[in-house]
Regions:
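Core AdoMet radical
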Residues: 1-29, 33-74, 85-100
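Auxiliary Fe-S-binding modules of radical SAM enzymes
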Residues: 73, 78-162
C-alpha cells in the first residue's frame, strides 16, 4: 500500500480522492505516508452505526478530508464535522436499493451550511439513478472544497478497499 501512496505523491499533476471504509488502517500508517497536497482522504459513513470512522480521518494529516455519506441508509444526527473539508451524499442505487429520505439529506446539507463545508449531492439512487436525478429542492449541489481550486490539477478518483 505504501508503494501506491509513493506513486500518488509523484503524480502531483493529479488529485487523488482516496475513499475507504477502513480508515483505521490509514490512521495506523499515517506517519509512514507522505501526505502531499494532491492526496485527499475520505471515509464512507452510511448510517450512524459508522460515525466512529470519522475520528480516524480527523487525525490523518491529509490536506483535504472528506466524508462520503453514500449510500445514505438512515438519518445521521449531530455528526461532528470539525476538520472535514467536504461532504458527499447520495442514495443507494441498483436492484433492491433501499430508499433515501429527503429529510436525511436536508439535515446533512444544513449541517454543512452551518459549518461552511461544501456539500455535494450525488444522486437520489434507485434502480434507475439517471431517471431519479440529483436535484434537491430544484437545485443541483456540486460544491467542491475551496482547497481544490488553488491547484491546476486533473481530478482523479482512486478508491481503495483496504
Amino acid at each position: 500500500m505504501l508503494k501506491v501512496f509513493e506513486t500518488m505523491n509523484k503524480a502531483t499533476h493529479h488529485i487523488f480522492q482516496v475513499l475507504t471504509k477502513r480508515p483505521q488502517r490509514l490512521f495506523e500508517m499515517k506517519n509512514d505516508i507522505d501526505w502531499s497536497e494532491n492526496i485527499w482522504i475520505g471515509t464512507t459513513v452510511e448510517s450512524e452505526k459508522y460515525i466512529y470512522r470519522i475520528k480516524y480521518i480527523e487525525e490523518i494529516p491529509a490536506r483535504v478530508k472528506f466524508l462520503s455519506l453514500e449510500p445514505l441508509l438512515g438519518p445521521i444526527n449531530n455528526i461532528n464535522l470539525n476538520g472535514i473539508d467536504w461532504v458527499i451524499v447520495g442514495g443507494e442505487s441498483g436492484f433492491a436499493s433501499r430508499p433515501v429520505k429527503k429529510e436525511w439529506i436536508i439535515d446533512i446539507k444544513d449541517m454543512c451550511k452551518v459549518k461552511n463545508i461544501p456539500f455535494f449531492f450525488k444522486q437520489w439512487g434507485g434502480v434507475n439513478r439517471k431517471k431519479a436525478g440529483k436535484e434537491l429542492d430544484g437545485k443541483i449541489f456540486t460544491e467542491m472544497p475551496a482547497k481544490s481550486t488553488t491547484r491546476n490539477n486533473k481530478l482523479t478518483t482512486a478508491c481503495f478497499l483496504f
